[in-house]
Regions:
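Contiguous, amphipathic alpha-helical segments that mediate oligomerization or scaffolding
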Residues: 1-57
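Amphipathic, charged alpha-helical segments and their helix-to-coil junctions
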Residues: 43-77
Length: 77
C-alpha cells in the first residue's frame, strides 16, 4: 500500500518532472552525457531533494520518493 506524505505545489512538480526526464535520458543514453554533466545532474537532484525535505517537512531518513506524474511524495516502506 502506498502512503502519500504530501502533495507538491505545481512549481515543484514541474521541477521534479524536469529532473526525472533528465534522469531517464541519462539512464537510457549515458554516452550522450559527459561524466561532469552526470555528476552535476545528481548534485542538482540531491539539492532538490534536500530542499523538498526542508520545505515540506519530509522525513530526514530519506525513505520517500516523488511520483513525478502526480506530484505525490510517497513513503517508501
Amino acid at each position: 500500500m502506498t502512503n502519500v506524505i504530501v502533495m507538491l505545489e505545481a512549481e515543484d512538480i514541474a521541477r521534479s518532472q524536469r529532473i526525472d526526464a533528465r534522469n531517464k535520458a541519462i539512464t537510457l543514453l549515458p554516452s550522450a552525457f559527459g561524466a561532469r554533466d552526470i555528476e552535476d545532474h545528481y548534485m542538482r537532484m540531491f539539492a532538490f531533494n534536500m530542499e523538498m525535505t526542508q520545505k515540506y517537512g519530509l522525513p530526514a531518513d530519506g525513505n520517500w520518493y516523488i511520483d513525478s506524474d502526480t506530484g505525490a511524495v510517497v513513503r517508501d516502506d
